[in-house]
């Protein structure tokens, strides 16, 4: 999987639904044939989808995987209203109007040796995309992926065969696909799922970071996507250990192309605090610049 340099041009295309698999708790994994978007998508990008001809407002959906070879993108979503319910009824071969890829993705120029990827809930898909990107485009990196969910994970899990000395031995649940790629992962939940850390994903991240020595910790950079409160905790964790941290924010969006300014957040810039649009100025920002995380 290779991706050219991110472009600001947005493409409107009629994507064809290739497959759609249902998982527990009304979670769905769809694969769309979308040549223009797949050619340009990077981890952190999203698409704006028309869920049904009778539903005026589009829905923003983060991209979980992108294949230039197959001209496809993967979307993972949960039914949470009329729009996503309409998506769940789509059949193989149906056409879905989408705009993409949108936004500023994760910056991947100066990777440190130990990228720590933290995803929670609907923020899991971009983290999977980033993990795959690191695997396919870099060498000598050792990413560690942590994912938390309070509903059953919408993918195959298994006890990990990759030992992590800094994590309790009984915390061994991993994402099978990441394990196949040779990427270390651990899962967390408050629901006592087998092998999962019984707590918040940031708590397990703290345990891991605390047990690293100073030299190891200097090689860590955090990339995260998830609910606002989780990202706030991730930001505090980065500050505690003096780590670089990029976060992908979640906000309600109307136009998703920068026109309505309905998804603005206060960001610290060189010129002072400014309102930035999550859709096009983000969704990825440096955690230390997000004002709401430091109040």
Which positions does each model-derived feature cover?
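Ferredoxin-reductase
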Residues: 2-92
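Local cysteine-cluster metal-coordination motifs and their immediate loop/turn environment
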Residues: 126, 228-230, 250-284
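Short glycine/proline-enriched turns and hinge-like loops at secondary-structure junctions
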Residues: 27, 41-43, 109-111, 257-259, ...
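A charged, well-structured terminal subsegment
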Residues: 282-295
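FNR/FR-type flavoprotein reductase catalytic core
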Residues: 85-247
């Amino acid at each position: 999987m290779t991706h050219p340099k991110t472009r600001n041009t947005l493409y409107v295309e009629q994507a064809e639904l290739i497959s759609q698999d249902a998982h527990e708790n009304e979670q769905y994994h769809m694969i769309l044939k979308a040549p223009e978007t797949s050619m340009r998508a990077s981890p952190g990008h999203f698409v704006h989808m028309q869920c049904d001809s009778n539903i005026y407002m589009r829905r923003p959906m983060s991209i979980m995987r992108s294949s230039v070879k197959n001209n496809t993108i993967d979307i993972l979503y949960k039914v949470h209203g009329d729009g996503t319910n309409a998506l769940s009824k789509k059949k193989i071969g149906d056409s879905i109007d989408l705009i993409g890829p949108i936004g500023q993705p994760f910056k991947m120029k100066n990777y440190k040796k130990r990228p720590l990827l933290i995803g929670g809930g609907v923020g899991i898909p971009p983290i999977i995309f980033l993990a795959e990107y690191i695997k396919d485009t870099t060498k000598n990196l050792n990413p560690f992926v942590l994912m938390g969910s309070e509903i059953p994970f919408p993918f195959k899990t298994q006890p990990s065969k990759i030992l992590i000395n800094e994590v309790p031995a009984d915390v061994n649940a991993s994402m099978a696909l990441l394990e196949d790629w040779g990427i270390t992962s651990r899962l967390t939940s408050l629901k006592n799922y087998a092998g999962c850390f019984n707590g918040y994903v940031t708590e397990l991240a703290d345990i891991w970071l605390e047990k690293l020595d100073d030299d190891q910790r200097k090689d860590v950079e955090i990339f995260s996507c998830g609910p606002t409160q989780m990202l706030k905790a991730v930001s505090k964790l980065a500050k505690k250990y003096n780590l670089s941290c990029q976060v992908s924010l979640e906000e309600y969006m109307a136009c998703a192309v920068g026109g309505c300014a309905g998804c603005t957040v206060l960001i610290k810039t060189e010129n002072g605090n400014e309102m930035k649009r999550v859709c096009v100025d983000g969704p990825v920002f440096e955690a230390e610049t997000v004002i709401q995380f430091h109040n």
